[in-house]
Amino acid sequence: MESGQPDLVSPTFSSISLTMSAQSDHLAIFMTATDTGVGKTTITAALVLALQKKGYRVGVMKPVETGLDPQQPETSDTGRLQSLLSPPPAFASICLYAFPQPIAPLACARAHGITIDVAGIATAFHIVRQQHSVCFVEGAGGVLTPLSPTHTIRDLIVSLNLPAIVVSRTSLGSVNHLLLTLEALHGAGITPCGIVLNDPLPSTQNECFIRQRTSTIGLIQEWSTVPVFGPLEYQKTVQTDWRRGMENLANHPEIHRLANHLIENEP
């Protein structure tokens, strides 16, 4: 692996010990979403910064990432999360499987003739967890995204024995997507500990859109038995200055409310 660039495809554990520690009492949360491109990394990053400001030593994992440019790893989700930590850990300790193709993890793994090892991810997670007072694990896509012929993201959450935060859009159709996601989590015995409503794209401020968004938010709050945070409006700064955008989002009252909720009601 040259110049700190990630070793695409092949997992490497060279930067961490593979001696399993005892189960940690430290706070750990799985970050999932109703879909891809909803803003998991954005919300994870904001929570990392918010909790760091409260004095917590925060760790992150993005065990599987697809669509990663090996020439610009710093622009990947993993690279951006890595940049928030001090000192920055090795890329490979955050992301065990990095694929260049922007397709589903199982399709990527098959294209490269490998199998994503959920048990191996769990081993790496427990080590990272022991080193931090708070740890976030970010998934890929939604909860039923296949990782291997036998395991989905949901199976990974079960294997890690973590509660989950679900990031959802506020656009039309999100009520159905979110309720299906919650049903899938509950069906596997996974505890959803929060819903974050996020606008990952600029909004069209016409009357129809505003009505759709307002009604979607209202119905999610009405139908959810899980605490709802947000909505978080699209952050234009994120596209031009990612770090500054994340600092701004970390100061958002709803991110603070979510961070406090996690600390005070440790799942």
Residue ranges: model-predicted function:
Residues S24-I29:
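Extreme N-terminal starter segment of soluble prokaryotic enzymes
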Residues P105-L147:
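Phosphate-binding/switch loop-helix module in NTP-utilizing enzymes
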Residues K62, I165-S168, C193-D199:
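Short internal beta-strands
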Residues E183-P267:
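C-terminal lobe/tail of nucleotide-utilizing enzymes
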Residues P149-T170:
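Inter-motif core of Ras-like GTPase G domains
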Residues V38-G39:
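Conserved glycine(s) of the Walker
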Residues T42-T115:
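N-terminal phosphate/diphosphate-binding loop that engages ATP/GTP or pyrophosphate donors
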